[in-house]
């Protein structure tokens, strides 16, 4: 895995102005999502997170604010916070969220935030936690969650248990993890890791297979294809999955 400075520089270089053509189509930067339309995706995420409308909520790895914009539109009385280590992306987020008084962002690592214990009703990740040690990220999220608060994880996972992958599929998975410097697990492994950490109760787990066409086109048409050696022939069997937990 790369260090924080590398990830910050990487996002500032490749995920700001160079993805403008993608931003014109979607502000929600995910490889897997049920809906390409941001409004529909926002409504789906709100339902998956079980947002009531009066909570204090944190997005860890908020990108350019696309998810926050949709959720803040749906829930104007909810207090939304977003953190990101990329100052370049947060500059874009300022414009995306300029009309929302219930949204604020700051430059922070989700592995070591400056929030007090028991601060948030909901903490969520949308394809962002794979850049860091899973256990460290989870422990920090649990720390800043209120008692009975909810943790939502929306992530890239393998389509089946890792031990059921063929040698070629496993080789492609390892290549993906190395070239994108992003940890990917199967659903069972994520659930087992969370159980081992403790302090959370699984409410629900879902899976979805639809890749984002906008995201795939962005990878094909930008420098991301070259720097990650992205080819159809070495794509591992991946899908999207989400997990909703309650702090106990």
Regions found by a protein language model. Give the residues of each.
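Acceptor-substrate binding/catalytic loop of class I
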Residues: 173-189
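A short glycine-rich, Lys/Arg-flanked "PGG" loop and its adjoining helix->strand segment in the class I
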Residues: 135-150
């Amino acid at each position: 895995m790369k260090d924080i400075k590398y990830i910050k520089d990487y996002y500032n270089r490749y995920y700001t102005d160079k993805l403008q053509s993608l931003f014109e189509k979607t502000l929600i930067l995910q490889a897997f999502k049920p809906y390409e339309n941001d409004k529909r995706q926002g409504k789906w995420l709100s339902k998956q997170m079980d947002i009531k409308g009066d909570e204090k909520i944190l997005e860890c790895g908020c990108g350019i604010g696309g998810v926050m914009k949709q959720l803040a539109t749906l829930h104007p009385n909810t207090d939304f916070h977003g953190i990101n280590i990329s100052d370049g992306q947060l500059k874009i987020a300022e414009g995306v969220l300029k009309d929302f008084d219930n949204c604020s962002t700051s430059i922070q690592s989700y592995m070591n935030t400056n929030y007090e214990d028991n601060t948030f009703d909901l903490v969520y990740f949308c394809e962002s936690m794979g850049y860091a040690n899973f256990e460290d990220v989870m422990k920090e999220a649990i720390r800043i969650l209120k008692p009975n608060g909810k943790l939502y994880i929306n992530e890239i996972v393998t389509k089946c248990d890792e031990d059921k992958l063929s040698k070629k599929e496993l080789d492609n998975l390892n290549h993906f993890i190395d070239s994108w410097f992003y940890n990917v697990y199967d659903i069972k492994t994520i659930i087992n890791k969370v159980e081992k950490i403790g302090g959370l109760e699984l409410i629900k787990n879902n899976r979805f297979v639809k890749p984002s066409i906008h995201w795939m086109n962005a990878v094909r048409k930008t420098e991301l294809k070259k720097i990650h050696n992205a080819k159809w022939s070495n794509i591992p069997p991946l899908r999207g999955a989400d997990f909703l937990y309650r702090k106990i």
